[in-house]
């Protein structure tokens, strides 16, 4: 007999007031409001335990259930979780426009979080704001006639979010019979702050030559600080801190061109480009000034780690390397088995950053009478992708690489012999060296679930034909201005360039550090379709 009880409740409400007015050359818009959220969750489960400590196995027929009759000396027969949370917010925005030439706007938001009420001498609310301005320079200044529109813009904003509420007393296991909470495995969070992002953007939009050419350019600089992080403390306790400061800055460019020499033909092309530079400015420090070490293992004892180090970038990848002779620099090999030695547990070889700095896209639309043809090419330059699939195939000797190595050994009479002369196996040269090792031992050393990372980390640069479509419109098919458009389309057709043996866009999970990771992922799919669109 198991008794399980679950109850959850959620409530959300908001309100908004708006005011708009025009005074001669000025237009004013104001919005103000607030929101509130309440949620609660209560769950507990009881499993009867005999005095011996073992669960009951015989059938039980009960007509009365009393908590005090349950044997409570075992921690295995009960469990529970209780969470309560609330958030409150007030906000306001204002916008002032002068003669449709200059616009200035700003916003203010104040948030209250229940999570912060759990700490003494701390105000549970935090304020954020933003401000921006834009100017239509073609309406303010006399510009060359080739310039149809020129807009300048700039903005600054702050946004934030609470620390998780369910880390502390609001979320703990409890004994449903006594109501007592079981001590948490979390060490007190000292001086908590909300995660905050401060962003600045500036750019311009311009249209030229009867708006046939359009350009947009934006520069951005965003700093994330007080990031919520978890570290392992003494005796299995968990330490939670706000720490670190990360900067993202870059540019975004968009260009378009429209060529329409007559009413029967037009060509519209669009190009976009983005560059992002990420840098970890500071990392969290202990009270004695020592830096916290924050890293994410790509898998249990995988030998591949994402490390967050001051001066580095988010997504820096490190891996285990071979053990080398301190004098000659040669890879150390076991003389009896021929297996190269690895520096297990020491993921110190930097292999690059997993994130691409450059992304691009180019689309084209050709219209001729009632026909329309469209295609999109996109890609990215840089970044790394990891294939555990290739590592496991090598480990089990089922990859083309291992087959080629065995064939080369047989065709070239290349063999490895153990130090005592007892064992002889097909051999191979360790890539880049003159050292001969057994084919099987080499690939079972560098492959598998704990690989020598450099062998299975690939450049993620790629370009592909992302989408293509052909459409025809039957005009006035159902009457005046009642048309039917038939189109055939395909997505993700093929790569124009790729270096990795897998799709660089593959992702094992949405969790941190699990993007760009392949572990026997499903093959990349192409899609084909036909669509009908009727307009009346």
PLM feature spans:
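Extracellular/periplasmic, surface-exposed regions of secreted and cell-surface proteins
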Residues: 1-305, 452-536
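Conserved small-residue
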Residues: 45-52, 241-244, 258-354, 385, ...
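Short, surface-exposed charged micro-motifs
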Residues: 59, 63, 93, 205, ...
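Extracytoplasmic gating/loop element in the C-terminal half of outer-membrane beta-barrel translocons
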Residues: 113, 380-485
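Flexible glycine/proline-enriched surface loops and loop-helix/loop-strand junctions
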Residues: 184-186, 345-346, 356-357
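Short, flexible active-site loops
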Residues: 345-347, 359, 371, 448-455
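Glycine-rich, aromatic-lined ligand/substrate-binding cores of catalytic
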Residues: 351-388
């Amino acid at each position: 007999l198991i008794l399980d009880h679950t109850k959850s409740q959620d409530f959300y409400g908001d309100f908004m007031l708006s005011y708009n007015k025009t005074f001669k050359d000025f237009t004013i818009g104001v919005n103000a409001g607030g929101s509130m959220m309440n949620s609660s969750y209560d769950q507990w489960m009881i499993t009867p335990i005999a005095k011996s400590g073992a669960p009951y196995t015989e059938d039980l027929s009960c007509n009365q259930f009393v908590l005090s009759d349950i044997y409570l000396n075992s921690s295995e027969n009960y469990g529970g979780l209780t969470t309560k949370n609330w958030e409150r917010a007030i906000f306001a925005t204002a916008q002032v426009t002068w003669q449709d030439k200059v616009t200035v706007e700003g916003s203010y938001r104040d948030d209250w979080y229940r999570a912060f009420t759990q700490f003494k001498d701390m105000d549970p609310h935090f304020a954020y704001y933003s401000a921006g301005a834009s100017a239509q320079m073609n309406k303010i200044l006399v510009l060359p006639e080739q310039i149809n529109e020129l807009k300048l813009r700039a903005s600054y904003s702050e946004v934030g979010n609470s620390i998780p509420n369910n880390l502390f007393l609001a979320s703990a296991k409890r004994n449903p019979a006594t109501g007592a909470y079981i001590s948490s495995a979390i060490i007190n969070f000292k001086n908590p702050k909300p995660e905050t992002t401060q962003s600045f953007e500036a750019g311009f939009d311009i249209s030229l030559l009867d708006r046939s050419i359009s350009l947009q350019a934006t520069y951005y600089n965003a700093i994330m600080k007080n990031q919520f992080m978890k570290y392992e403390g003494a005796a299995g306790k968990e330490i939670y801190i706000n720490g670190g400061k990360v900067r993202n800055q870059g540019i975004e460019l968009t260009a378009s061109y429209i060529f329409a020499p007559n009413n029967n033909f037009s060509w519209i092309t669009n190009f976009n480009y983005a560059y992002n530079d990420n840098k970890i400015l500071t990392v969290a420090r202990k009270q004695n000034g020592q830096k916290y070490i924050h890293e994410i293992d790509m898998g249990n004892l995988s030998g591949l780690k994402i490390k967050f180090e001051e001066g580095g970038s988010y997504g820096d990848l490190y891996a285990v390397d071979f053990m080398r002779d301190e004098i000659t620099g040669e890879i150390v090999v076991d003389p009896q088995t021929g297996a190269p030695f690895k520096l297990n547990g020491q993921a110190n070889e930097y292999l690059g950053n997993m994130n691409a700095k450059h992304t691009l896209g180019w689309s084209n639309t050709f219209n001729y009478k009632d026909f329309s043809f469209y295609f999109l090419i996109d890609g990215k330059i840089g970044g790394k992708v990891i294939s555990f699939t290739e590592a496991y195939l090598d480990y089990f000797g089922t990859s083309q690489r291992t087959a080629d190595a065995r064939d080369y050994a047989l065709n070239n009479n290349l063999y490895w012999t153990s130090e005592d002369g007892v064992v002889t196996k097909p051999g191979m040269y360790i890539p880049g060296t003159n050292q001969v090792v057994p084919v099987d031992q080499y690939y079972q050393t560098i492959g598998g679930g704990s690989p020598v990372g450099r062998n299975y980390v690939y450049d993620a640069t790629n370009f592909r034909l992302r989408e293509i479509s052909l459409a025809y419109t039957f005009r006035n098919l159902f009457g005046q201005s009642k048309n039917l458009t038939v189109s055939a389309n395909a997505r993700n057709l093929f790569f124009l360039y790729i270096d990795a043996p897998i799709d660089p866009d593959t992702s094992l999970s949405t969790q941190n550090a699990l993007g760009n990771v392949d572990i026997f992922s499903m093959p990349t799919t192409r899609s084909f379709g036909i669509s009908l669109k009727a307009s009346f």
